[in-house]
């Protein structure tokens, strides 16, 4: 089974993730985003995606936490392949972060840009987030206060269950 990890809920990224999901019947989509759950659900429901084929994670607030916060979900799904969806300009940073977070996990990352790679992010940002991912890999810390994480994980579970209820009501 493949897992598609969509970093953020912007329309182009979601469109790419939905296309991948539709073309890969044995896959599950994880949307890791701060976008309102209703916006993401609307896009998924409009595309006719079965609610059992996706998980929405609203606990991440940056690239590092997009990966670190979804590790337990990816492990639970038992995948060996993670298809990473983000903008082309963001892909280098995403793949560097993902490589550290999933180092020696048996999960292979595959880039799937939602837009052309027409420019890159600053090297300082790539290096900073890669260093934070390395720190996470060896210490399980992301340089964020634990209380912030605890607050966000509670929101995630509330929104996850609310999202399931909303998607059930919105299904035809």
Question: PLM features: residue spans?
Answer:
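A structural signal for short, hydrophobic/glycine-enriched beta-strand patches
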Residues: 1-127
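Short, charged low-complexity intrinsically disordered segments located at boundaries
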Residues: 71, 123-131, 160-168
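A transmembrane-helix-recognition feature enriched in membrane-embedded lipid enzymes
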Residues: 122-146
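Charged phosphate-binding loop/patch that engages nucleotide di/tri-phosphates or the phosphate backbone
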Residues: 140-172
């Amino acid at each position: 089974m493949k897992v598609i990890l969509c970093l953020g809920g912007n329309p182009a990224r979601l469109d790419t993730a939905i296309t991948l999901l539709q073309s890969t019947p044995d896959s599950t989509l994880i949307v890791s985003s701060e976008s309102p759950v209703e916006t993401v659900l609307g896009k998924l429901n409009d595309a006719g995606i079965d609610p059992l084929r996706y998980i929405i994670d609203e606990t991440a607030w940056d690239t590092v936490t997009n990966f670190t916060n979804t590790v337990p979900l990816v492990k639970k799904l038992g995948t060996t392949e993670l298809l990473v969806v983000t903008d082309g300009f963001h892909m280098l940073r995403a793949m560097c972060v993902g490589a550290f977070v999933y180092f020696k996990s048996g999960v292979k990352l595959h880039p799937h840009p939602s837009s052309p790679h027409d420019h890159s992010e600053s090297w300082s940002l790539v290096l900073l987030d890669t260093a934070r991912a390395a720190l996470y890999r060896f210490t399980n810390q992301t340089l964020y206060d634990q209380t912030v994480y605890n607050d966000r994980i509670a929101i995630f579970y509330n929104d996850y269950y609310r999202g399931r209820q909303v998607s059930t009501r919105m299904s035809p």
